[in-house]
Amino acid sequence: MKNGGEATIMISALHLKKQFVKTVAKDKKNKKSSKVEFYAVNDISIQVSKGEILGVLGPNGAGKTTLLRMLATIMEPTSGSISISTKDNVQITDPVKVKQEIGYLSGNTKLYHRLSVREMLRMLGEIYGIEKSECEERIDQISKLLDMEDFCDNRIERLSTGQTQRASIARCLIHNPSVYIFDEPTLGLDIISSDAIIHFMKKQKSEGKTVIYSTHYMEEAQFLCDRVIMIYQGKIIASGTPDEIMQNTNTSNLREGFHQTLKNYGEGEHEDEKIKSLI
């Protein structure tokens, strides 16, 4: 953590692995397809502290989304364990209870397009068992926090891309979770919506919440993250503060540090070209 002091571990993952099976194209001679097992995530362990923003970096297909889905208990790991601290500092591992402490956002998050943002949040409040008066107060707070006051009563199907993304994030906030897990939350957004989401993540950090998020925007990660991990082929190949990554790679910014880390890991010109094609 940037602020120093002994940190409270909010979420801990030990030796996470996720194995998938993919079908390989038919052999021209035998006209048979074959199945190959592979690990999208291969023995990853992380601990994230209260009030910390952790950035998850890596090229497409590196395993970022699979890792985040396992941390959010949306996907069950093949092996490994995940635990989270509640607001009362109680360690829990039951996936159902873990979900109650997490706000998760992915690119596949579905909204109720026929409802207004406010109506959707009210419905989610009922699902979480939040009292009506408390729910209305939460909606007003969230609307102000994410700069949604101008469109909170508009139907979701009429919102812009950036407004829809803010509504998606609002969906994660209604139950006041301790940990936020976001998969590329600013991808493809205009600067106003992107800045609103960045401001939100900084605000949550200042309130002691934990944020884990993936991004391809290195400048954003350098500015926002207390710590980053770089994933390639399902493994962590580097971790540390943005400054430590830059120092270890003798680079002047995180983007250069990212490229240099991948190049160092590839060990050779052929692998270097392969890596560039992924980015």
Q: What residue spans do the PLM features occupy?
A:
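Conserved ABC ATPase signature
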Residues: 155-159
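Conserved ABC transporter NBD signature motif
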Residues: 80-91, 97-98
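ABC ATPase "signature
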Residues: 239-240
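Catalytic Walker B motif of ABC-type/P-loop ATPase nucleotide-binding domains
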Residues: 180-184
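Helix-to-loop junction immediately C-terminal to a conserved catalytic motif
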Residues: 72
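Conserved ABC ATPase "signature" region
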Residues: 122, 126, 133-151
